Amino acid sequence: MKNKVTTIFLSDLNPFSKSIEEWASNKALTIERIESKSQDIDELVDGVVVFHENHNISKEIEELQGLLDNSNRPGHRIDINGTLAATKSNFEMWLERNKPSKLLFLGSDELPKNENLERFLSNLM
């Protein structure tokens, strides 16, 4: 994420959020926690990134992404079981096009059990 992302927002305290915090701990990123039902979430973030496995996305995450989409906040979905090179390239193009500095990362509690999450995160920077 060489594209000036400075802050990652994480909703709730769950295994996915903990994985992202661990990954970001040695990066030049600020981690902020917000409640997923926060009324002003669209004022806090510039975009949302939804991590998923094979398009398995919870209703709550779908609704939150929809709320941000209605507020003209760009969203990107990352299938951690997809091809790493293509997924990384698409994400980098999305970052370049939208130029977000504050992103909300969302993912299910089950994602950290998939070794592809760590593999993808380690290739982000």
Question: What residue spans do the PLM features occupy?
Answer:
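Acidic/glycine-enriched connector segments
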Residues: K2-K102, G107-D109, K113-L121
